[in-house]
């Protein structure tokens, strides 16, 4: 369907320009994005990272059709009504839709659109394409220059000084957890300096425990 194709194109769009809009989505202006990002093909990303992200974010990724109904219900109640937990309900497909299409406003309408679009995206892209796109667009905090980074290649280069295809299992495990809270978990501050001992301990623990 044409609508599915348009959705795929929107999800794949990696723009260096950020659009500022009014509440009705009409355009205010366009500004250059400050994100450092280098999109790469799926075969240029280590399987270590792919496996780590699936294990961390969406263990049912290979089998679901875009959503996990029980998890969606639990997370929707948590985020909108304040009942239970609001975490753990979004598949990688839903997270990709949230980042690229619908945003993260805590409303039933937004969540419903996210679910419908996630199901549609799984019709238009295969699992490897969805995972690769997720890894190319997700925020990963800051690099060692203090610049905001998005995409696994920028994260690999900016944090470990290697390409995404060369990430080891411990490095991949560390990077896989960054999109959950990229600025908090980033080992670097806005000026490029190493952050607090607490954050560095997290990096050290993750690297040492993931052999």
Where are these regions (language model features)?
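Short, small-residue-biased leader/transition segments that mark boundaries at the very start
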Residues: 2, 207-211
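Envelope-exposed proteins and targeting segments
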Residues: 14-16, 36-38, 49-51, 68-70, ...
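Soluble periplasmic/extracytoplasmic beta-strand elements of cell-envelope proteins
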Residues: 17-23, 27-32, 39-41, 52-55, ...
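Non-catalytic, structured segments within soluble enzyme domains
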Residues: 92-206
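Flexible, acidic/glycine-enriched loop-and-adjacent beta/alpha segments
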Residues: 41-92, 144-160, 167
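Solvent-exposed coil/turn segments that connect beta secondary-structure elements
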Residues: 23-26, 33-34, 45-48, 56-59, ...
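N-terminal type II signal-anchor transmembrane helix
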Residues: 1-21
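N-terminal post-signal-peptidase region of extra-cytosolic proteins
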Residues: 4-7, 33-42, 56, 115
């Amino acid at each position: 369907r044409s609508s599915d194709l348009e959705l795929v194109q929107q999800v794949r769009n990696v723009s260096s320009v950020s659009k500022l809009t009014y509440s009705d989505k009409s355009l205010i202006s366009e500004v250059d994005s400050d994100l450092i990002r280098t999109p790469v093909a799926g075969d240029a990303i280590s399987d270590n990272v792919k496996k780590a992200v699936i294990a961390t974010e969406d263990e049912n990724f290979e089998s679901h059709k875009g959503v996990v109904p029980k998890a969606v219900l639990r997370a929707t109640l948590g985020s909108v009504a304040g009942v239970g937990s609001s975490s753990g309900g979004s598949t990688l497909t839903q997270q990709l839709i949230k980042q690229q299409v619908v945003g993260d406003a805590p409303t039933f309408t937004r969540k419903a659109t996210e679910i419908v679009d996630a199901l549609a995206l799984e019709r238009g892209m295969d699992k490897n394409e969805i995972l690769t796109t997720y890894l190319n667009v997700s925020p990963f905090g800051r690099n060692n220059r203090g610049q905001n980074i998005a995409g696994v290649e920028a994260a690999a280069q900016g944090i470990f000084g290697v390409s995404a295809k060369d990430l080891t299992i411990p490095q991949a495990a560390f990077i896989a957890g960054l999109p959950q809270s990229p600025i908090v978990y980033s080992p670097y501050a806005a000026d490029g300096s190493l952050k607090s001992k607490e954050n560095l301990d997290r990096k050290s623990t993750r690297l040492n425990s993931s052999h």
